[in-house]
């Protein structure tokens, strides 16, 4: 299991990336949920070194391949002795970082039994993200979609978008801004 991070870590970043700036949904957020199947039998047969290169992070610590700790900055310019990028050009973490935007995200594991036709385990991630505009998510997905090595091991099965209403002020009610 890989540690999953690269979320906004400071209050200002939530304002910049997560909470809607104005209109009836000011201080609300967009929530996108995806069900992502992992072809676990293939992934489990993949060597640890290739798994880490696929993510661009170390499996145990979650650190970038150029760091030691989970929250160390990625050095996207670092090259090894043969002149290759330490974090490969098709690594998931590199590509997500290069999209030049941020979202609040979290993934939860799921298991849904086995496929009746193939006998393969139906397992993966329920990916949940929060962002001030759905375009942030779209930009990241477009950047990942064309080059991400992780796509060899996953299939997106379902997706939904929701709006999370802003909080309620004292004496107010949920959705009040929608009707004002």
Where are the regions a protein language model picked out?
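Long, histidine/aromatic-enriched segments associated with O2/redox biology
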Residues: 3-180
């Amino acid at each position: 299991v890989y540690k999953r991070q690269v979320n906004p870590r400071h209050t200002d970043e939530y304002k910049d990336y997560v909470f809607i700036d104005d209109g009836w949904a000011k201080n609300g957020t967009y929530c996108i949920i995806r069900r992502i199947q992992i072809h676990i039998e293939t992934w489990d047969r993949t060597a640890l070194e290739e798994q880490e290169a696929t993510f661009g992070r170390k499996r145990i610590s979650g650190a970038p391949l150029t760091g030691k700790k989970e929250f160390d900055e990625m050095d996207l310019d670092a090259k090894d002795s043969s002149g290759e990028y330490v974090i490969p050009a098709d690594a998931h973490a590199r590509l997500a970082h290069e999209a030049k935007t941020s979202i609040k995200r979290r993934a939860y594991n799921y298991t849904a039994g086995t496929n009746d036709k193939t006998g393969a385990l139906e397992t993966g991630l329920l990916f949940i993200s929060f962002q001030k505009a759905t375009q942030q998510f779209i930009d990241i997905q477009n950047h990942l979609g064309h080059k991400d090595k992780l796509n060899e091991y996953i299939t997106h099965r379902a997706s939904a978008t929701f709006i999370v209403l802003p909080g309620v002020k004292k004496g107010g009610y949920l959705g009040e801004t929608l009707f004002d």
